[in-house]
């Protein structure tokens, strides 16, 4: 993939969505003035300290109702890269990366459709690398530096992520969906045991049963009742 290095830009996702290229491209920036998380969330990042990048894909071969598989593949690449540096890294549904109980990375996906096909998909990711302090009201951010006391080369980490992501992308292109889903489940945060969750009706205890290829989370209650949720419909307490 071609990598475009930028110094300061409002959003790498928006930059790639406006690029109008048929090639797969990665845009990485030292700073994003309007970096976005999921929905209306903002991403706090000190200039030049963290890894902020987006990947533009044209996966016309992937059914629209399975687009979440791209998020799974990206999450697996992130988890593998970071876990090699700081063990105990997991994937928190739907698209965060956690070290223990703290968030070290988040991902946002923007999609353009052409009829019933996925025309353009932009996967934007922020990873806390060398930032020493966080000042926003985000509840639990953490960086590699805070964990290890060391600074890291952001480009080395980016290339490691891409080297893991591209083979996973090939698996999806060849229809090996089940392999990706299985790997994803192996690395889920809170994948074992009962944990507290909260939806519009209040707090409850449940265990993760599985996640569908469309991103739907299935939770199993203590009485074996099943509940299903899409993004933003439930959160971990």
Where are these regions (language model features)?
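Long, positively charged amphipathic alpha-helical accessory segments at protein N-termini or as interdomain linkers
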Residues: 62-63, 72-88, 99-237
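N-terminal lobe of the biotin/lipoate ligase/transferase fold
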Residues: 1-84, 153
């Amino acid at each position: 993939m071609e990598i475009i290095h930028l110094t300061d830009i409002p959003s790498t996702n928006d930059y790639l969505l406006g690029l109008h290229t048929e090639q797969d491209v990665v845009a990485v920036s030292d700073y994003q003035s309007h970096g976005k998380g999921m929905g209306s969330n903002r991403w706090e990042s000190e200039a030049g300290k963290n890894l902020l990048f987006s990947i533009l894909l044209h996966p016309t071969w992937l059914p629209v109702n399975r687009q979440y598989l791209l998020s799974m593949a990206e999450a697996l690449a992130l988890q593998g890269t970071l876990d090699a540096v700081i063990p105990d890294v997991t994937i928190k549904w739907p698209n965060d990366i956690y070290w223990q109980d703290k968030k070290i990375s988040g991902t946002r996906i923007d999609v353009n459709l052409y009829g019933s096909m996925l025309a353009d998909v932009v996967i934007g990711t922020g990873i806390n690398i060398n930032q020493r302090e966080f000042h926003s009201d985000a509840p639990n951010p953490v960086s590699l530096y805070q964990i290890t006391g060391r600074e890291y080369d952001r480009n080395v980490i980016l290339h490691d992520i891409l080297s893991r992501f591209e083979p996973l992308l090939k698996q999806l292109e060849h229809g090996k969906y089940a392999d990706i889903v299985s790997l994803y489940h192996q690395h889920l945060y809170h994948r074992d045991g009962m944990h507290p969750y909260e939806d519009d009706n209040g707090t409850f205890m449940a265990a993760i049963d599985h996640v569908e290829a469309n991103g739907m989370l299935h939770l199993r209650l203590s009485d074996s009742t099943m509940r299903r949720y899409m993004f933003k419909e439930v959160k971990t307490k």
